[in-house]
């Protein structure tokens, strides 16, 4: 085990379209955090992998230098380097991992390969005193899944999306309505002014046992409505946005209820649900989820809204959690576009 002295971790996140670097300390202090959200993708209505990779190349070195300088540390003060190694866009992952390995090699500091989903999952422990085990729902642009978190590096999947991720569906619906990218915040804003009962959308799998998701049918239903709509004005956009959000809320409530029952059947000590990932920043969905969880005698916890999307702080904290267990990596690890959270294997 690593000693109980304060540890300082330099963290690098390049798994998608955010280039982020942070310096985080084991007493939960953020010494610096630099994040650059790439605006280049807006015109395309989604992330273009090649553009994302080139942007990481252009920004990562300067962001790393700025983050170290802002932290008041130098490389000698860093105890370890944590880097997102997957899942994600392979081009961006390679760039982040190469930078982290270079720093580790030059400084002879340990390196920790971090699973992006583990970083989202463990971040809650930086802000709340939550013990293992607990239930987590990850809802983001690339993932939608329930897992039991037994410990750092020990996860059990209960259910996941059978097709699209939830964040992906928000982006695609926003694109159908010419609302721009990212779609989630825009649809949430429009839905506030709309009538959620204007259009009926299918609630896939809602009457089935389990906690898997399917969102492709909702996406198709919205497309059919948009194609057949003669006039697409602001009222229509607000109403379809509200109907879409209401549909997603119904599905989440149903799936969360099932996941709670499944998790307690596995371990009756589980009484907390963590909701994380970019879609967890949606306050209308948070309200629906919070009511559902309370009705099921559970407690729900969310990371700070600004840290629901990808960031360096979560990678740094995951690095600290792994370092506290003595989990470090060899320099020969490779980035992985796919890396299921339940498949993590740790060695100290």
Swiss-Prot record:
Gene Ontology terms: biological process: tRNA threonylcarbamoyladenosine modification
Disulfide bonds: none
Binding sites annotated in the UniProt record for Fe cation: 116, 120, 310
Any one Gene Ontology molecular-function term assigned to this protein's record: N(6)-L-threonylcarbamoyladenine synthase activity
Gene Ontology cellular component annotations, sorted alphabetically: cytoplasm
Coiled coil: none
Domain of life assignment: Bacteria
Reported cofactor(s): Fe(2+)
Catalytic activity: L-threonylcarbamoyladenylate + adenosine(37) in tRNA = N(6)-L-threonylcarbamoyladenosine(37) in tRNA + AMP + H(+)
Localisation: Cytoplasm
EC number: 2.3.1.234
Residues engaged in binding substrate: 138-142, 171, 184, 282
Name assigned to this protein: tRNA N6-adenosine threonylcarbamoyltransferase
Organism in which the protein naturally occurs: Ehrlichia ruminantium (strain Gardel)
């Amino acid at each position: 085990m690593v000693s109980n002295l304060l540890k300082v971790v330099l963290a690098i996140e390049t798994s998608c379209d955010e280039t982020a670097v942070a310096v985080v300390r084991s007493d939960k202090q953020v010494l610096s955090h630099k994040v650059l959200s790439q605006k280049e993708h807006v015109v395309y209505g989604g992330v273009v992998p090649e553009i994302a990779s080139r942007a990481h190349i252009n920004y990562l070195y300067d962001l790393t230098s700025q983050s170290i300088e802002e932290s008041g540390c130098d490389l000698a003060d860093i105890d370890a380097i944590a880097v997102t190694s997957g899942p994600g866009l392979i081009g961006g992952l390679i760039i982040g991992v190469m930078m982290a390995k270079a720093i580790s090699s030059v400084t002879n500091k340990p390196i920790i390969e971090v699973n992006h989903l583990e970083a989202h999952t463990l971040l809650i422990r930086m802000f709340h005193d939550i013990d293992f085990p607990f239930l987590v729902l990850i809802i983001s642009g690339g993932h939608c899944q329930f897992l039991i978190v037994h410990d750092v590096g020990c996860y059990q999947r209960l259910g996941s999306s059978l097709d699209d991720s939830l964040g992906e569906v928000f982006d695609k619906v926003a694109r159908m309505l010419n609302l721009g990218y990212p779609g989630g915040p825009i649809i949430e804003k429009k839905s506030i002014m709309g009538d959620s009962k204007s259009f009926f959308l299918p609630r896939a799998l809602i009457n089935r046992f389990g906690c898997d998701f399917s969102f492709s049918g909702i996406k198709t239903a919205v497309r059919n409505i948009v194609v057949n709509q003669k006039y697409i004005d602001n009222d229509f956009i607000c109403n379809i946005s509200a109907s879409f959000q209401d549909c997603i809320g119904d599905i989440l409530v149903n799936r969360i209820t099932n996941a709670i029952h499944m998790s307690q059947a596995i371990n009756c000590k589980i009484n907390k649900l963590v909701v994380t990932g970019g879609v967890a920043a949606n306050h209308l969905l948070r309200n629906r989820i919070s009511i559902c969880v309370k009705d099921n005698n559970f407690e729900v916890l969310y990371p700070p809204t600004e840290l629901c999307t990808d960031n360096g702080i979560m990678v740094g904290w995951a690095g600290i959690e792994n370092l506290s267990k003595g989990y470090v990596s060899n320099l020969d690890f490779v980035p992985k576009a796919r890396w299921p959270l339940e498949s993590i294997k740790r060695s100290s």
